[in-house]
Curated annotation (Swiss-Prot):
One of its GO terms (biological process) is tRNA processing. The keyword Cell wall biogenesis/degradation does not apply. This is Maturase K. The gene is matK. It comes from Saxifraga mertensiana (Wood saxifrage). Pfam families: MatK_N. GO terms for cellular component: chloroplast. It comes from the Eukaryota. Keywords: Chloroplast, mRNA processing, Plastid, RNA-binding, tRNA processing. GO terms for molecular function: RNA binding.
Length: 353
């Protein structure tokens, strides 16, 4: 048993202001303040062929804030079916342009990480084929005893997304615009339940890039701390984790010192050291395999549940983590059902006189 320090290096890699506040500047606070749909909205519809850029986003914000003879009141939205469609179009293009801009620093960090790993250009373009995972499983999982099939929880409340990114980006304009887009999406979903035949329901299908950015930022927050503690507690092998690390779009080691709330983790930081443990994440699930005992796997299960609840404020049901013995159970991975075959051998001994 060992106790780990309550400090670790955390890379808040873009704490300075973004470029886009210099572009939008005077529009962001007015737009974020008015997210309850009580302002005037333009009636005319502008088609941009699903193309998003900072210039398009700025023009849309300008037209949404202007008032002329083409505007209608939000109270008249029930009488005019085109109002909701135009509002959704603006929110969609703004969120798409927002996602493009905020992906820039993450892309730069990914390129820097690839250069540090000295990956050749041909491999960099493909970012490690997914088929390389299966030889890894065949070579390593046959020597393991237990595997935990983990369903990664996702924050339900919108404000948790803002809190997660607040420690990454020290930019008030960024947080205001993010909060506006999230509440705008929530309002559209509420309206879609009342008017299912209208075009409001297309918002969830059209903003995939924006929500993919939010999901990856949340996963990066979770994995950066989790992998650090795994390295401290169980010597998680970099070669095992490296099979998927190039495919994690927002991976990066963190540099700024922050304090883990020691009171929250006082009961779960006591972990047994295990010389062999592997972690693999795919889609919204993860696999944690070990050569340890059932008690060790239960300790990790207890730790993960408390980690999500205490640090990320995400409630996780313990039944979402299944612990199985590889010799008796199989586990699903990337659409395949994997299991370990137990080879029984007969040993004969003869007494020598």
């Amino acid at each position: 048993m060992g106790e780990f320090p309550g400090y670790f290096e955390l890379d808040k890699f873009w704490q300075q202001d973004f470029l886009y506040p210099l572009i939008f500047q005077e529009y962001i606070y007015a737009l974020a303040h008015d997210h309850v749909l009580n302002r005037f909205i333009l009636l005319d519809n502008f088609g941009y062929d699903n193309k998003s850029s900072s210039l398009v986003v700025k023009r849309l914000i300008t037209r949404m804030c202007q008032q002329n003879h083409l505007i209608i009141s939000a109270n008249d939205s029930n009488q005019n079916p085109l109002w909701g469609h135009n509002k959704n179009l603006y929110s969609q293009i703004i969120s798409e342009g927002f996602a493009v801009i905020v992906e820039i620093p993450f892309s730069l960090r990914l390129v820097a990480y690839v250069e540090r790993k000295e990956i050749v250009k041909s491999q960099n373009q493909n970012l490690r084929s997914i088929h390389s995972i299966f030889p890894f499983l065949e070579d390593n999982f046959v020597h393991l005893n237990y595997v935990s099939d983990i369903l990664i929880p996702y924050p339900i409340h919108l404000e948790l997304e803002v809190q997660t990114l607040r420690s990454w980006f020290k930019d008030a304009s960024f947080l205001h615009l993010l909060r506006f887009l999230l509440y705008e999406y929530q309002n559209c979903n509420r309206l879609s339940t009342l008017t299912p035949k209208k075009s409001i329901s297309i918002v969830s299908k059209s903003n995939q890039r924006f929500f993919l950015f939010l999901y990856n930022s949340y996963v990066c927050e979770y994995e950066s701390i989790f992998i650090f503690l795994c390295n401290q507690s169980s010597h998680l092998r970099s070669t095992s984790f490296g099979t998927l690390v190039e495919r994690i779009y927002f991976y990066g080691k963190r540099e700024t010192l922050v304090e883990v709330v020691s009171n929250d983790f006082s009961l779960v930081l006591w972990l047994c050291k295990n010389p062999l443990m592997h972690y693999v994440r795919y889609q919204g699930k993860a696999i944690l395999a070990s050569k340890g005992t059932p008690l060790l796997m239960k300790k990790w299960k207890y730790y993960l549940v408390n980690f999500w609840q205490c640090h990320l404020s995400v409630w996780s049901n313990p039944v979402r983590i299944h612990i199985n013995q590889l010799s008796n159970h199989s586990f699903g991975f990337l659409g395949y059902l994997a299991s370990v075959r137990v080879n029984r051998s007969m040993v004969r001994s003869q007494m020598l006189e």
